């Protein structure tokens, strides 16, 4: 997703502390300050007009005095769990049900928060973006007011990075 923002020439807020690795060869595009958003969200005021990556559990801590347009990327839970297991390098079978309920709760809580606070958002299903990029990208382009040609955005989607694919 962040590669799409980069291609669309969005101003991405990142500190490049977490660099690309074998799990994410295109990089993470993260901002260290986001990890502390629960205690301090003041940094968001300095990021007006920028694109920032915030994981679902932390969305509910954003500064409500600011305006947002949220692109909510939803990944298949089994694929998330498989990816986490590979990144951590250990079998997570015992913890998977716990993670499953926590993940589901965070996603739903984030949706409710966005709706309750009238924050404009679009949900993009990770699998759909890969399987039907034209439709997803057109929706994303409309939502973000991107003028980047569809084909240019489509060229960014790298199927080889979809390594933790659940069978349909």
What are these regions (language model features)?
Residues 1-50, 158-168:
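PAPS-dependent sulfotransferase catalytic core
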């Amino acid at each position: 997703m962040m590669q799409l923002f980069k291609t669309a020439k969005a101003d991405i807020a990142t500190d490049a502390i977490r660099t690309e690795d074998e799990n994410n060869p295109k990089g993470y595009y993260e901002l260290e300050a986001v990890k502390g958003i629960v205690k301090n969200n003041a940094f968001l005021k300095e990021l007006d007009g920028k694109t920032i990556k915030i994981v679902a559990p932390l969305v509910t801590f954003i500064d409500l005095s600011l305006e947002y347009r949220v692109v909510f990327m939803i990944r298949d839970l089994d694929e998330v769990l498989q990816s986490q297991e590979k990144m951590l390098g250990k079998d997570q079978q015992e913890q998977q049900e716990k993670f499953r309920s926590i993940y589901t709760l965070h996603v739903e809580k984030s949706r409710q928060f966005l709706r309750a606070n009238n924050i404009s958002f679009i949900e993009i299903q990770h699998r759909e973006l890969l399987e039907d990029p034209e439709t997803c990208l057109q929706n994303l382009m409309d939502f973000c007011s991107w003028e980047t040609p569809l084909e240019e955005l489509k060229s960014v989607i790298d199927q080889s990075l979809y390594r933790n694919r659940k069978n349909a």
